[in-house]
Amino acid sequence: MQREKFSSRLGFILISAGCAIGLGNVWRFPYIVGKYGGAAFVLIYLAFLLILGLPIMVMEFSVGRASKVSAALSFDRLEPKGTKWHWYKYGAMAGNYLLMMFYTTIAGWMVQYFIKMMTGEFEGKDTAAVAGVFSDMLAKPGTMTFFMIIVVVGCFAICGMGLQNGVEKITKVMMLLLLALMVILAARSVTLDGASEGLSFYLAPDFHKVVEYGLFDTIFAAMGQAFFTLSLGIGAIAIFGSYIDKSRSLTGEAVLVTLLDTFVALIAGLIIFPSCFAYGVDPGEGPSLIFITLPNVFNSMAGGRIWGALFFLFMIFAAASTVIAVFENILSFAIDLTGCSRKKAVIVNIVVVAVLSMPCVLGFNVWSGFMPFGKGSGVLDLEDFLVSNNLLPLGSLVYLLFCTSRYGWGWKNFMKEADTGEGLKFPKWAKFYVSYILPLIVLFIFVQGYISKFM
């Protein structure tokens, strides 16, 4: 069967960026930027993106393009005879399914909140009542299941239309609308009365905060965010390498994807901080920022119902772009491994992903007694921990060693693939760094993740 290809370079870059751009860009990045010293932190973060995230992304793209298949078969095709690199296919597949087991539920929340904003449900509510809307939503497994299934069916339906006609065409429109919405929301936020304080908190370099939190903590926060923001290690990015030709070198393409991801994260901060400071609200981070803090801010704002609806529309696009990208990977696993049609893979996986997403839905209500990491934790935290703290760093380590070790695909093969085509070349002098130092950094992130979680 002839492998499908992207119809344009723009489609490839926007879809790869859509996979990388996730909810963490909005609910985590701005918060840690403000906490660790604004622009001072951003500079450290950008340095780590360059030396940590970028090389691994180039390696994922290279493995995908050279093998022309998903992570379900890419190691089988490229590994030296008699080696066992292909065992990691199970880790990659598990990572994609695990990520969707909670992401579909959160994407469903975004759809619910968009409707709530549009219908004016928050108007006239005080802070406690707005928080009550969120806890009421979590207490209703039936409603959450309904919206989760809408996300699963809707995003798989787009994938079912094919790579060019479905995934590429629709994600391109979504990503361009996402970027336009962000610019409009940021322009509104920075022109609010009192927004300047939020801007200086976010962007003014504050080296005192770097000292206050400790240089090590600041560097580790920057390192972790740079590593996790690009969703590397589970083959979610590699799949898009398998859909492109060899006309462009892969380092240049990875730089563009990384820049887009960074642009979205930085602009998210321009939406959140000026508006929170303008209304005297502590931004915080995580789901409470999106579902409690910001609805309160929109409540206080002239035309807040419209701005709130636009914000949640942007969040739907951010979540859906990731879901569609990962669903495309999940479908390609099925197609590559079984040779089944795209349509059959879609039908089977709609059922599989919907069923696998149920523990996350039930973890907030029926199964709320299950607290894997102590009080306040739930099923979602366990699923997130398995992906973020385990499969992403360990998978990245596999890609690194596979592309640099003579027992794997090897440095020469990797460099030949990465540098084929016009554009920026992968630096030859980086061989020692990516072969010996970068694997140690990734291992450090893995170990440190356990230390900060359990100690």
Model-predicted regions and their roles:
Residues 5, 11-13, 19, 141, ...:
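Loop-to-transmembrane helix boundary motifs in multi-pass membrane proteins
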Residues 5-16, 41-44, 83-97, 145-151, ...:
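Select transmembrane alpha-helical segments in multipass membrane proteins
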Residues 3-4, 32-36, 66-91, 104-164, ...:
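Inter-helical loop and helix-membrane interface segments of multi-pass membrane transporters/permeases
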Residues 10-48, 235-241, 252-255, 259-260:
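Transmembrane helix-boundary motif of multi-pass solute transporters/channels
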Residues 378-401, 423-455:
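A generic transmembrane alpha-helix motif of multi-pass inner-membrane proteins
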